[in-house]
Amino acid sequence: MRAMRLAAVAMATAGLSLAGPAIVEAKTPAAAVKTVAPESVGFDSARLKKLDDYMAGVIAQKRVAGMTTLLVRHGKVVAFNTYGTMDGQSPMTKDAIFRIYSMSKPVTGVAMMILYEEGKWKLDDPVTKFIPEFRNLKVMTGVGPDGKPTTVPVTRPPTMREIMSHTAGFGYGLQIREPVDKMFRERGVLWSADLPDMIGKVADIPLKFQPGTDWSYSIAVDIQGYLVEKLSGQKLGDFMQSRIFGPLKMTDTGFYTGADKASRLAKLYQTDIRTWQMVPATELFGGAVPDYTKKPALESGGGGLVSTTVDYGRFAQMLLNKGELDGARILAPATVELMGTNVIPKSVLETLSTKQGGSFSDAVGFGMDVMVVNDARKAGSISGDGEMSWGGAAGTWFWVDPTNDLYFVGMVQRLGGTGGEDLQIMSRLLTYQALVKPEN
């Protein structure tokens, strides 16, 4: 699990804004983006070049084929860079479309919080209020002599708070080290025919632990996608388009590109576990890589979206602005603050600080579909308190830092890691070492 971040998108006084009306007149939104002098927003240009040099080095080392990065502070674009190629030949473009996988999760979280504001659900509602199929959930306790799982009934149904924070106990199937995850993989949960089919499969697989007693990355955000459909009466993609993508002018974000934008979809690579080299991707979590140019039958809120650097930057800027961008109000400020507030119980955090390799502690927790930094210095980071972040399976990442009023979006397309230093860690470090006048 990795920490990622976000921040702000716009233009200098003499330029255009990423969010402004003039963008619509450009061929793509990326074409209208202008950058400002780093010093005008507190950065040192020479120190910031270390970030550019590092990313260029990642390409030179053939760790990824191509990359884009976007750094924004005070709504002004400090740096918007491309590196490498789209497909091993064509240069990477600023309007390239990427499979963002789990960076879909914060978007689904926003969709859920829109419905929360409408009174459609409450944090302590049992999920069975909306999904009766989960009434007979069980918890795995071990494996019997016959090789089958031994289970006990849940002491209570998971709550919506737990569904929003990976503390409900569900498995996932991204990895198959644990028995529950192996069941997810064997039953093809991620490859279900549609969301109702997925819910039926999940209902028959035991939880990893009693709800609220642990944290485990899970299918919960795909369950949220199903909940969005039930609570809104719309398909997930239609709801996101009408309530998020349309208002935010995220013109290239959705569950597929369509034939007209297929040429802008960056090629997907994976790590060959025998050589640790980068090769074209053929497999994804036990199945074939989907065709992202065609509308899927199952719209995955947990990992199905494609997007561009600029589009996701607009989403990040909305969060940084506490729910609003260019006059489009998506959420109330207090709701964004709620999303960015840790909801993992203290007793669970104390256990996780060791079990999750130090990823969680009283300094770093998890809110509504985002990782949150409560105390950056205590966490050993030079970023800001209140940071929200996440990333995706193919290496995409972002963070939003309200303390320093900035965000960062990074896009790559390599499954299985980037074969070296963690891009999220290095991009954060090199960004903040260059922010020498945070008061500006």
Language model regions located:
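Bacterial N-terminal signal peptides
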Residues: A8-A19
